[in-house]
């Protein structure tokens, strides 16, 4: 173990396991403060057991069990609304005997700010062009103007204090537009919580009650953005956040133990705050689906790297977010090929879902954004592949036979079983 720039790096055997840093991407008001990325825990070293924006064109797919009376209701101060079931949601279907599971991929984004680089809107387009849907983990305070900082009461910190910068007024407006459009396109709006505190007095030190406070504030910033911003000219978000929010990812992946206890009281269905694991089928942690980032093979080495942009950055340019431009193209290909290696391993093997996490950032000339885009374009239209949200994956897992899922969890990532004998 060694510490570099406040980041703990652990090297064990053939796998380089980096502390995962779920920071907030670049883009004007979304810039992070210096030192906002302290260390996180490593994955287990044990091997796996062997007028609102109009909806996009196309049919509206809804859960038939979700009833709606057809009436749009404005909620609270007009920040949100109830417009019925979310459009473009696939109906989860139980595997038939002998059926091979779909190959699921989940692309998720921490922070979800529409900054000057307009990456939120860009990746919405990438998703639409490739039959994909994505999860956007919103930092709640990105809807809170700095002038209203006193509304933010972070656990163990002063009122209004943040480890990241407040968004500009224009970025708040732009982010609201993106959230509205993303939900109507079938994307998921999850949470990255609020102040992005890590390390001492961060999420890892918070009690269950403090996590509950953080979660309540996550709801409040979305449900009261009109009051907080004074933007009366904008339409409400087309969803009831109390009903839609199903999970999130904690900053720096810290504090999952107490977070899960708090999340359960809100009825959340999954959590993506695990510090990492192998590519195996998910399991539940105290009734909540655990969706960790995963170790994927790094080309030309025996190492595996966790499936998030910062981990590739560290492998390639260390602490520098802008390394040698001569290396950018090679680094982009290595990052892309790592993700594709992880994909091919399970696509031709266990079919365990692949989770890829990212930020809206421009590190090393934006190569990590391009690598993710390359992967979306390469795999999301392939036979048997479904690029979905975490919420949609939870829907699918919930209708499967628990005994079949238990057998699938025993598979090594590259192990291709006899599906006819496994799925009964």
Regions found by a protein language model. Name each.
Residues 117, 195-233, 283-348, 368:
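Alpha-helical scaffold elements lining the catalytic groove of polysaccharide deacetylases
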Residues 81, 135, 270-283, 337-424:
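C-terminal domain-boundary segment and adjacent tail
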